A protein has these predicted regions:
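Active-site loop/oxyanion-hole signature of alpha/beta-hydrolase fold enzymes
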Residues: 77-108
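Intrinsic disorder/low-complexity signal
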Residues: 7, 32-33, 96
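Conserved HGGG/HGGXW glycine-rich cap/lid loop of the alpha/beta-hydrolase fold
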Residues: 24-82
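N-terminal cap/lid segment of alpha/beta-hydrolase-fold proteins
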Residues: 8-29
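Residues at structural and domain junctions
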Residues: 9, 36, 84-87
């Protein structure tokens, strides 16, 4: 789903992830993917909600030649499991998930 203020013509070309996987965090199993340049400047995309997840169009927001884009489905959202769960789903835990993902991917 596109933002009402962003026209498709203004986005970067579509790209496929060069890496995707899952990260186990207590009872949550988080889905993530990386796209763009493996040696590019890291950038993290956080999707909206509630319940929404990442979409292929989100990969188009960043220049794939300059950025290593990390996208992930937050707790209870998208391809993360359990879907729609609010158990152990707080802002503090989200911040912990982001830090764990950063370390898992070896990003300084």
């Amino acid at each position: 789903m596109m933002n009402a203020f962003i026209q498709e013509r203004d986005l970067f070309p579509a790209s496929l992830p060069f890496h995707s996987g899952r990260l186990q965090r207590d009872l949550h199993d988080l889905y993530f993917e990386e796209c763009g340049s493996q040696t590019g400047r890291p950038v993290l995309f956080l999707h909206g909600g509630p319940g929404a997840g990442i979409a292929p169009s989100h990969r188009r927001f960043f220049n794939p030649d300059r950025f290593r884009c990390v996208l992930f489905d937050q707790r209870g959202c998208g391809q993360s499991r359990p879907f729609a769960s609010i158990e152990s789903n707080t802002t503090d835990l989200l911040i912990g998930d982001i830090e764990a993902l950063r370390q898992h991917l070896g990003i300084d």
